[in-house]
Amino acid sequence: MSRTARIERVTKETKVLVEIDLDGTGKADIETGVGFYDHMLHQIARHGGFDLTVHTVGDLHIDAHHTMEDAALALGAAVDRALGDRAGIRRYGAATVPMDEVLVRAAVDLSGRPYVVHDEPPLAPYIGPVYPTSMTRHIWESFGQSARITLHVDVLRAARPGGHPDAHHVVEAQFKAVSRALREATSLDPRFTGVVPSTKGTL
């Protein structure tokens, strides 16, 4: 069974195309116009093991908010569609990822119930010229809502003792941790082929 999806989201603010194959090999074709965001979406493909295309044209002459939000919404919708009825999946996934001085934990439940908890310290306002660090939480909230998942992202350590957080490392470690957790949660459990992982019988 093919676990793929294609989502096109068009508004007066953005035009987004997302294609995903949950059983891919980490290939990525990413163009959002926000360089650091492109870098983060590459992490999702590589560390999630997904083949991922994200093409976005947005109103970057205003700011990056709509572009980043709508790409996250479309990505979540693509994951939701690719999962189908969610039968046979492991459902739960968790990963703790270090990136030098930073340590991040992510936990995922493909529950069908959108809920996001995100905890990170104050960071420098921008990474690169146009990625506002305040948007990271909103990305996870938008993604979790449209993917219909429960997602917890906790920055356990943001800096070495006495140091200041490196925003690049803090955000990148989050994307890598979430990707690894998603990889586990979306993977198929051969012991329960065709079985929805819930006592309710549906997710």
UniProtKB/Swiss-Prot annotation:
Gene: hisB
Record Gene3D superfamilies: Imidazole glycerol phosphate dehydratase, domain 1
Family the entry assigns: Belongs to the imidazoleglycerol-phosphate dehydratase family.
Pfam family, one: IGPD
Record bears the keyword Membrane: no
Record's keyword annotation contains Nucleotidyltransferase: no
UniProt pathway: Amino-acid biosynthesis; L-histidine biosynthesis; L-histidine from 5-phospho-alpha-D-ribose 1-diphosphate: step 6/9
Enzyme Commission number(s): 4.2.1.19
Listed GO biological process terms: L-histidine biosynthetic process
Primary localization: cytoplasm
UniProt-recorded Gene Ontology molecular function terms: imidazoleglycerol-phosphate dehydratase activity
Catalytic activity: D-erythro-1-(imidazol-4-yl)glycerol 3-phosphate = 3-(imidazol-4-yl)-2-oxopropyl phosphate + H2O
Superkingdom as given in the UniProt entry: Bacteria
N-terminal signal peptide: none
Annotated protein name in UniProt: Imidazoleglycerol-phosphate dehydratase
Cross-referenced InterPro entries: IGPD_sf (IPR038494), ImidazoleglycerolP_deHydtase (IPR000807), ImidazoleglycerP_deHydtase_CS (IPR020565), Ribosomal_Su5_D2-typ_SF (IPR020568)
Swiss-Prot/TrEMBL keywords: Amino-acid biosynthesis, Cytoplasm, Histidine biosynthesis, Lyase
Location(s) in or outside the cell: Cytoplasm
One GO term describing the cellular component: cytoplasm
